[in-house]
UniProtKB/Swiss-Prot annotation:
It is found in: Cytoplasm. The lineage of its organism: Bacteria, Bacillati, Bacillota, Clostridia, Eubacteriales. The gene is sepF2. It comes from Desulforamulus reducens (strain ATCC BAA-1160 / DSM 100696 / MI-1). Keywords: Cell cycle, Cell division, Cytoplasm, Septation. Transmembrane segments: none annotated. Gene3D superfamilies: SepF-like protein (3.30.110.150). Cell division protein that is part of the divisome complex and is recruited early to the Z-ring. Probably stimulates Z-ring formation, perhaps through the cross-linking of FtsZ protofilaments. Its function overlaps with FtsA. HAMAP family: SepF. Disulfide bonds: none annotated. One of its GO terms (cellular component) is cytoplasm. The keyword Cell division applies. This is Cell division protein SepF 2. One of its GO terms (biological process) is division septum assembly.
Length: 161
């Protein structure tokens, strides 16, 4: 009984005898608590961060259709969200007008836009792509010579004797 009394007295004063087996769980539990707190703070930081998608590489397709049937590939590229440059220099003017009308309709249906680049070269872009600069189809029609004159001067040149 005196030993129990002495242990209680020493414990009261602050001189308690602690075994190593008792200290080890306290240390490990404090380490576990710190680890848990760190993991919780990391998870809070991760939940606040949002992933920013990398800008996807946009390819610009360049085509030179020969006939009206070739325009289907231009429409497919526009549907897939790819800008298309169309060169109509090697096409008969009447066929070129049909291609231009069809491709403009596709671009309009997809909320895209069209711009004249130079001469008979046009840029068609899907929605979400902005074209900055002068010249579009409205100004193209104003600056172009009438189709009859173009057909006569380009394809049906008459020789004078």
């Amino acid at each position: 009984m005196s030993k129990a009394f002495l242990d209680k007295f020493l414990n009261f004063i602050g001189f308690e005898e602690v075994e190593d087996s008792e200290k080890a769980p306290e240390l490990s539990s404090s380490r576990e608590t710190k680890t848990k707190n760190q993991n919780q703070s990391k998870s809070l930081l991760r939940s606040e961060l949002t992933a920013v998608p990398a800008p996807r590489s946009t390819k610009i397709i360049s085509t030179q259709p020969r006939t009206f049937t070739d325009v289907q590939t231009v429409a497919e590229h526009l549907k897939n969200g790819q800008p298309v440059v169309v060169n109509l220099s090697q096409v008969h003017p009447e066929e070129a007008q049909r291609i231009l009308d069809y491709t403009s309709g596709v671009a309009f249906a997809l909320d895209g836009s069209a711009k004249k680049i130079n001469g008979e070269i046009f840029l068609f872009v899907p929605s979400g792509v902005d074209i900055v600069g002068a010249g579009d189809l409205r100004t193209f029609n104003e600056n172009v010579e009438p189709l009859e004159e173009k057909v006569n001067s380009r394809w049906f040149k008459t020789e004078t004797a």
